[in-house]
Structures are given as C-alpha cells and as structure tokens.
Amino acid sequence: MAEIVLNVEVRERTGTGGARDTRRSGMVPGVLYGGDKDPVAIAVRANEFRKALYTGKLLGHLVTLKYGNETQPVIAKAVDMHPVTDEPQHFDLYRVDEHQQIKIEVPVHFTNQDDSPGLKRGGTLNVALHTLTVSCPADSIPEEIVFDLTGLEIGATIRVADLKLPAKAEAAVDGETVVASVAGAMAEVAEEAAEGAEGEAAAEGGEE
C-alpha cells in the first residue's frame, strides 16, 4: 500500500503562465499522465507537497492520488526544483495499477567499505551505476539495492548479476553490466606494472 496520499485539484490553466499562477496561489503544479487516459493538469498545496517530498517516500514510490472521493494509485516520476530556492516547481505523476509490472530506477548503495581489503589498502570504489532499472509490481518497488563490499580486493568488478534483488524485482538491464569496481591507487598500479615488466624481462633472459 502507498504510504503517501496527495490531495490534488484540477488546474484550469495550463502552460507557463498557468503554472506560474498556480505557484503564486500557494500550490505546486503537476501533470497526471499514463494509462489509456489523457494527461490532466493538477496541483497540490505547496506545504502538503513539501511534506510528502521530504519524507523521501515520494519520488519513485507508489503514491495515492486523491481527488474528491476518487483515488488513483500513481508513481511520482519527476519533481523539478527551483535552482536557487530549492522549492518544488513542478511534478509528474504516472497512473498505474497496484499490481501492474513497471520499470523504475532504484538507488544502489554500498556497505562495509571498511571490510574491503582493497579499499583499506588505498583503493577507490568507482561507481558506474548509482541507480538500477528494475522490473517489478508497482506495489513492490524496492527502497534500495544494497551490495556488501566485504572481502573485495583491488581489481574486483561488481556486475548487475552480482546484486541481490528483492523478491518480485528483476534487473531490466544486462547482467554483465558493470555497477562498480575497486581500483588501485596510482602508486600501487605503477608498482604492479613495474613488477610485471621485471618479471617478463627475467623470463625473457632465462629463455636465452
């Protein structure tokens, strides 16, 4: 079930001017789209929208939209913020069925950096994917995907296939896609390269 309920009003005026008037009236303009229905211009009271946004349970989550006595499950797809005031300026909601299979981006987080021998030796975790696109029911969107770095050495590569996804969720990208890697410090890389060159030289000398 959705944790957040947004009480919306339908906007009569659309476009830049309509959105500006909506914000001046203390509301945040938005658009409801998706499904087999036409897009609808909507608005939510600014204080209610900010409260929902700052819970961290709005963007990318299943939300209940309420208009009068009617309700509609939606996914909050995007929120535009003002570059100076950091106030919400506009939002997009996507109509869904609670059990509908959807594709959505989920944040990827890494734990136990201190238990990675490679990182403890000065290595760097190079993250290629900060989010992963998954396919899952709308009412089972994962909060996050967590990868345990325990035991990883320098040179280790983490791929999508290595991630443990929650029940009902499947990766929507190739399993060989690189998520992150543990790279060595430059000095260590240079030292290993030098050792490799010395080993090759010694081997060639032995063959003569």
Curated annotation (Swiss-Prot):
Kindly state which keywords UniProt assigns to this record, in alphabetical order.
Ribonucleoprotein, Ribosomal protein, RNA-binding, rRNA-binding
Q: Which GO terms describe its molecular function?
A: 5S rRNA binding; structural constituent of ribosome
Query: Which InterPro entries does this UniProt record tie to the protein?
Result: Rbsml_bL25/Gln-tRNA_synth_N, Ribosomal_bL25/Gln-tRNA_synth, Ribosomal_bL25_b-dom, Ribosomal_bL25_C, Ribosomal_bL25_long, Ribosomal_L25_dom, Ribosomal_uL5_bac-type
Set out the biological process GO terms recorded for this chain's protein: translation
- Give the residue range of the signal peptide: none
Q: Which domain of life is it from?
A: Bacteria
Q: Identify the GO cellular component terms for this protein.
A: cytosolic large ribosomal subunit
Family, per entry:
Belongs to the bacterial ribosomal protein bL25 family. CTC subfamily.
Q: Which purpose does this protein serve, as stated in its record? A: This is one of the proteins that binds to the 5S RNA in the ribosome where it forms part of the central protuberance.
What quaternary arrangement does the UniProt entry report? Part of the 50S ribosomal subunit; part of the 5S rRNA/L5/L18/L25 subcomplex. Contacts the 5S rRNA. Binds to the 5S rRNA independently of L5 and L18.
Which NCBIfam families does the entry link to? bL25_bact_ctc (TIGR00731), PRK05618.1-2 (NF004128)
What protein is this chain from?
Large ribosomal subunit protein bL25
Q: What species is given as this protein's source?
A: Phenylobacterium zucineum (strain HLK1)
